[in-house]
Amino acid sequence: MANSNKNQENGWGGLWTEQKLDCFENYVKAYLTIMNAYREKYHWKLIYFDGFAGCGDRAKQKEAEGKTIDIFGQGSVTKEDMHLYEGAAERVVKLDKMPGFNYYYFVDKYEDNITRLQLKLAQYDIGKRTKYLHSDANYEICRLAKFMKEDAVRRTTPDKPFHYKTLCLLDPFGMSIDWDTIVTLAGKSLDLWILVPTGSIVSRLIQNDGTLRYPETLERFFGLPQKEIHERFYIKDQVHDLFGEHEEIRKVKNSIEVISEIYCEQLGTLFPYVTNKPLVLKNSNNVPIFSFVCASYNQTAVKIAQQIITKRQN
């Protein structure tokens, strides 16, 4: 129990998880309500894709004890901690009677997570419409993007009976998604929700002494060159003292906000509509640890997302 309390204090689970899930569930309800109203008219097939499905189990995983994962040298977390990082799979599947999605894709790199998730969701009547993939999220996202691109081409043929719409949730444990992967989703008939680890992981790599820790990782994450990232997080001052004039570098005060701003700006280069105020998720010490962002080619989708976020944030 002591470990569980510590995990919540450090941000791996707790109230913020419920806030994220409540927000997303409300969006899924609104999404399905709208899509169901026009599904038959426009011959839509709906796909739900969860790139980090996990098992959604907060219970202690005894078999995970002693197995740790180091996140960029910032300390180890157990696989139990990762289970606290609850996914949205069961909440989405529970909405299947609305009706829900035509197809469900649940991805997780840990085989035991996928196995437990499959057992948990067996009680719901989603059967052959569901794929459980023990795989890397970056790889599967690129596969999804390729499928959506091919579907867009098929859509131009007069004899094609339907086309696909996708709702994609990416809530990785850390900086697992490369920006090049996100780029593949541009131009697709897809709504994206992504969890950005602002204060939990990324901020730890923006050091106070003016250096970026693991700069290559930051480049992959933001999709920006190291020089540009450095310029966003550090300010150069010309200082005059007894030794003459010299330059000092200081870190911006609102670095966690800047992380979120940069990521949203980058999403804006791929999607015409992005929530301008993401859902800011905080730990028990009221420190922002994640930003939950929605991006889409559909203005109404992001408008609804922003309304839900604003209500949750207030």
What are these regions (language model features)?
Residues 1-314:
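Class I S-adenosyl-L-methionine-dependent methyltransferase catalytic core
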